[in-house]
Every structure is written in C-alpha cells, then in structure tokens.
C-alpha cells in the first residue's frame, strides 16, 4: 500500500501541462487522482431503425453516475465506434457532456481516419466542455512509429485536455508509449491492450514516468493489475457499480472484500469473452430498462443462445446484492 501512496504522491507533484491553458467555463482541471479508477467505455444504444437512441444514451449516463464511476468514455471500441458517422460523433458527444453536467469526468473519443479528422474531434471535445480526450490509432491501423507519433502529436497540439491513448495497433507498444510520454505532456493515460497487460503495467510503473497505466480486456485482470499499482481499467457499462466497489475496496485496504466482489464480476467478464459486447447491452436492458433493446449496428443476429442467457441469469442473481442502481 505504501508503494501505491508513493506513486500517487509522485503523480500529484507533477502538474498537468494543461493547467496553464484557458478552457471553456464548463470544463474542469482534473487532478491526477481524478484520472485514475474506473473509466467505463459506454455502449451505444440503437433503435430498431439503427439510429442512435438518445433517450437510452442519456439513461446510460445517469446510470453510470449513480454507479459512481470515476469517469466515462465515448465513443471507443466497446461503443461500436467504427459504425458511427462523423455527424453522430459530434452530436452525441455533446449530448453526453450535457447530460453528465460535470457529475463525473467525460472523455470524448477523438480517433479518426487521419490526423486531420482527429484534430477536428479534439477541438470540438474541448469546445463542448469535455474533461479529456481518448484516442485509438488512425483507422488505417498504421503501426509505423513515426506516423503514429505525428498523429498523436497533432491531436495534442490542438487541445490542452488530458489525453488517454489506447493501444490499438502492433506499433503501439509500451516502449512507444514511454517515448510518446516524454514528448507530449498532456498524454496522461496509457490504455494497455496487449496479451499480458499486468506485466506491461509493471513496466510502465517501474519506469517512474507520469503516465497512468490503464487497461482494457473487460477487467478480467483487475485485482492482479491493482496489485501492480495500475491506474484503473476501462471496461463495459453493465456491471459498472461492481467495478467501482472492487477499486474502492481494494484501495481502502479491504483486499479480501474486493476479491469477493471481483469473483462476481469476473463471471460476467468471462461470459463477455464468448458473447461479445452484446452482453453489455443485454445487462443494461435488464437493469431497469437502461436500454430498450440489444440492437447492434453491425449485425441483426442476436449472438447469445439459450444457455448463455441462463448463465447470465445466474450471474446477475449472484451480483444483485452489489448493484447500486
């Protein structure tokens, strides 16, 4: 625990490069501690017509706030970002920022086909009062280190908001993140998606830099990662309240209690690996009708079968005592 406090003290001592920049009145300066924790990747709800369901999206925002998430991210991979149009990303980014109203940090996904599109998203995110930016690599999946550096540098050049970067191509290694962190002061969160995220977290933490290591992977390694002094995870929305409890209990020194909740969460995370992101939508549908349906934009086929649904029944029954909403 003392090592965790030492790292956080180090983080707190390094001011964000964005602190000196002017921001829209509705934006806030995030402390280093506020950049850590459970930053949920929001799901994107659709009507049967495949248009985005704004009412359900707003309910998801409120649901996540009530789950006490440390932050939320939209759009990103779990939010079917590649299926969204340019106009939709602009319109519904503002819907989310307006709905959340500063109750928890909102990071807007700014990745694009190229640096010019990404720069436009980044400018817009700051204009509407987002708290941070989240970026994957360019949509051509470039792994060229020079091109990737140019792309992320361009994003950082048009906004002083803290930047979260998600590993999304083979060229985005831990070494790449460390080099990029030296170059871009606003690059604060490195989201690791490699085959062995816990080991890469240890490498990032051991380097003693200002980067905060976060992970994807559905949160399946969360306890292991926290033991290595991770800065959080970015998983789906369905069991957000359990994720928050795991994080908060662990960092309060209640490791056994955190593991007990994690065991309930892990059963869902394992099922998601087989069923895909549709599971998150099914959970949100069941949890008080946050979503009205489970429509995915890429397929009309419902990919969960009877046995999957029965397994989810049992998982949700076991997790119910930990639901906040």
Language model features: what each stretch is:
Residues 91, 95-99, 124-128, 154, ...:
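Alpha-helical structural signal in soluble globular domains
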Residues 169-265, 269-273:
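Catalytic alpha/beta core domains of metabolic enzymes, predominantly
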Residues 57, 89, 93, 118, ...:
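A general structural signal for well-ordered alpha-helical segments in protein cores
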Residues 37-39, 71, 105-107, 132, ...:
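Structural preference for beta-strand elements that scaffold enzyme active sites
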Residues 1-17:
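N-terminal secretory signal peptides and thylakoid transit peptides that target proteins
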Residues 11-14, 41, 226-230, 237-325:
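C-terminal alpha-helical cap/extension of soluble enzyme domains
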Residues 32, 46, 51-168:
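Active-site beta->alpha loop and helix N-cap motifs at the rims of alpha/beta catalytic domains
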Residues 22-54:
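C-terminal segment of N-terminal export signals and the immediately downstream linker at the start
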């Amino acid at each position: 625990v003392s090592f965790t406090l030492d790292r956080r003290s180090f983080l707190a001592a390094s001011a964000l490069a964005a602190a000196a920049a002017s921001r829209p009145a509705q934006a806030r300066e995030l402390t280093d501690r506020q950049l850590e924790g459970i930053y949920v990747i929001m799901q994107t709800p659709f009507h049967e017509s495949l248009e985005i369901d704004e009412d359900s999206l707003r309910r998801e925002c409120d649901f996540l706030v009530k789950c006490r998430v440390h932050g939320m991210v939209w759009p990103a991979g779990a939010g079917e970002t590649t299926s969204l149009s340019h106009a939709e990303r602009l319109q519904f980014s503002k819907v989310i920022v307006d709905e959340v109203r500063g109750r928890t940090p909102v990071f807007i996904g700014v990745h694009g086909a190229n640096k010019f599109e990404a720069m436009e998203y980044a400018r817009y995110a700051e204009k509407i009062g987002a708290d941070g930016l989240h970026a994957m690599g360019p949509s051509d999946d470039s792994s060229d280190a020079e091109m990737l550096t140019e792309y992320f540098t361009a994003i950082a050049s048009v906004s002083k908001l803290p930047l979260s970067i998600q590993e999304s191509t083979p060229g985005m290694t831990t070494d790449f993140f460390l080099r990029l962190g030296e170059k871009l002061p606003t690059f604060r969160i490195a989201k690791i998606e490699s085959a062995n995220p816990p080991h890469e977290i240890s490498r990032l933490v051991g380097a003693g830099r200002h980067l905060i290591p976060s992970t994807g992977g559905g949160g399946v390694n969360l306890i292991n990662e926290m033991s290595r002094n991770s800065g959080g995870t970015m998983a789906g929305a369905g069991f957000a309240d359990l994720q928050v409890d795991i994080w908060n209990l662990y960092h309060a020194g209640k490791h056994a209690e955190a593991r007990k909740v994690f065991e309930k969460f892990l059963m869902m995370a394992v099922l998601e690996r087989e069923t895909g992101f549709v599971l998150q939508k099914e959970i949100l549908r069941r949890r008080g009708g946050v979503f009205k349906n489970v429509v995915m934009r890429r397929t009309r086929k419902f990919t969960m079968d009877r046995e999957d649904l029965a397994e989810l029944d049992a998982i949700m029954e076991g997790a119910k005592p930990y639901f906040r909403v």
